Amino acid sequence: MVNLFHGDCLDILPTLADDSVNLVLVDLPYGTTACKWDSIIPLDKLWEQYNRICKEDGAMVFTAAQPFTTILAASNLENLRYEWIWEKPQGTNPMNAKVMPLKSHENILVFYRKKPTYNPQMWYSTPYSGFSSETSKIGEVYRSEEHTSELQSH
């Protein structure tokens, strides 16, 4: 079952039960314009609520654009896992075209405490040749998720 809420998140989030949400999918204000609605919401208050309502293996997914992407990522390095790039077919923000390039992508930041269910979307392609996952040591260069909290302490 999907429940959608429309309103101020700082009013709605406290009404949700603890550990009741599988996915938080959010497009917060980025604070990149002078518009009243584009004010950055206090991230510490949001994280307090998101961590309370999200199940232990729930995911918190945010759309963002620079410089907000960096602010958002730095606000919760402990739970930041990866970033996707949302490539757009046409650049946006034409009002600033004379002073900066059009924005052709947005960032999608994924946070979680415990690995959520992940169902990879496969596509048809030609298999790699010359090595296999059983003989390749490429996976050994990546650190585990637990290492992220070690980075926090330095």
Language-model segment annotations:
Residues M1-S149, S153:
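Core catalytic lobe of class I
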